[in-house]
A protein has these predicted regions:
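Beta-alpha junction/loop-to-helix N-cap segments that form part of ligand/metal-binding clefts
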Residues: 104-165, 259-283
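Bacterial lipoprotein signal-peptidase II cleavage site
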Residues: 19-43, 50
Length: 358
């Protein structure tokens, strides 16, 4: 009986042992399967991360390989506009090297040609357009409302764009730089250089809105100082000499604003004013070199360079041109032509930098 009982107990013990072994084996199997699943998930995550990194690298490579084409429409060839264009190109080339190319076109002073040039730029789907001078900017603005348009050598954007209550931004695909020198400062220069003069003639092209704006503004400043001011306007280069002669006949001195037609005709103006002995104060350096005695001027190369920096910010950094404020020239310089000042008997006070006539 005792032997039977012992046999039963041994059998029960063996059964429990087998059950325990089976449970351990199942647990081991489950653990192995869980480990395999975890490893598979980790591997998949690593593969996804690697894929994302590869995509990012490809995108970065694509960005670094991107090239840009910029159209430049310049109204006319003269020193100031040439310098602005050169500064603009240099700024972009400094930052982008051979990743930027320029299609540079000159309209030879013809506004309709500006329109043709800018329409071609738009047809070619260029990345950005520079309008150098008011007529060029106006043509670019008329040609596109999607491609970014920057202006340079623009005196007053409100006048150029027909915007009332100008605030400094356009809210559109347009911004740029202004070459407007302080007209009150120019009036001050005239007063210190020509204290005995009474009659001032303002000589400019009637078809240039920026010149009209400057003439109207500085006329007020000069009249406040006691000068009698008369405007003498020409419609194009054909009547520059005749109008200049009229101005010289009736003026003690002549003021010429930043006027593109005048800038292109300085030799013709000088050929009349020099024999007449009438001094000319100008709104910018290039005109002063050609026919003037003094100026309060900006540096047009620097102005163009600043415009190029704005272009880079738009093209590469994604700046919103519609909210970019129009930028002004950083510095203004009093300059004079010594030979002309001496010939006319003008005493130039300290603070003026000597420049060479052309």
């Amino acid at each position: 009986m005792k032997k039977k009982m012992l046999s039963v107990l041994l059998a029960a013990a063996m059964t429990m042992s087998l059950i325990g072994c089976g449970s351990t084996a199942d647990t081991a199997t489950d653990t192995t399967e869980t480990t395999d699943a975890t490893e598979t998930t980790d591997t998949a995550d690593e593969a996804t991360d690697a894929s994302d990194a590869s995509t990012d690298a490809t995108d970065a490579s694509a960005d670094s390989d991107k090239t840009y084409t910029v159209g430049i429409c310049q109204l006319v060839q003269h020193e100031a506009l040439d310098a602005a264009t050169e500064g603009f190109k240099t700024a972009l080339t400094d930052k982008l090297g051979d990743k930027v190319t320029f299609d540079e076109q000159n309209a030879a002073g013809d506004a309709p040609t500006c329109s043709t040039i800018c329409t071609t730029f738009v047809t070619n789907d260029y990345d950005l357009i520079l309008g150098n001078a008011t007529a060029a900017l106006q043509a670019a603005v008329a040609a596109t409302d999607t491609i970014p348009v920057l202006g340079t050598s623009i005196t007053d954007y409100g006048t150029a764009l027909g915007v009332d209550d100008w605030t400094g931004t356009t809210g559109k695909n347009i911004s740029g730089t202004t070459d407007l020198a302080p007209l009150d400062g120019q009036a001050d220069c005239i007063a210190e250089l020509f204290p005995d003069a009474k009659n001032v003639g303002i000589l400019y092209c009637s078809s240039e809105p920026n010149s009209i704006y400057q003439s109207t503004t500085i006329k007020g400043y000069l009249e406040e100082k006691g000068y009698t001011v008369t405007e003498y306007t020409f419609s194009d280069s054909n009547d520059v000499a005749a109008v200049t002669q009229s101005a010289c006949d009736n003026s003690d001195l002549i003021y010429i604003p930043t006027d593109n037609t005048a800038a292109s005709c300085t030799e013709a103006i000088n050929n009349v004013a020099d024999p007449a002995g009438v001094p000319i104060f100008t709104g910018e350096e290039g005109i002063a070199k050609g026919c003037g005695v003094a100026t309060l001027s900006i540096n047009y190369y620097d102005l163009g360079y600043k415009t190029g920096e704005m272009a880079y910010d738009i093209l590469v950094n994604g700046a919103d041109i519609s909210t970019m404020e129009v930028q002004s020239a950083p510095n203004f310089t009093k300059e004079y032509i010594k030979d002309r000042a001496d010939k006319l008997g003008i005493t130039v006070p300290d603070g003026y930098t000597e420049i060479t006539a052309e």
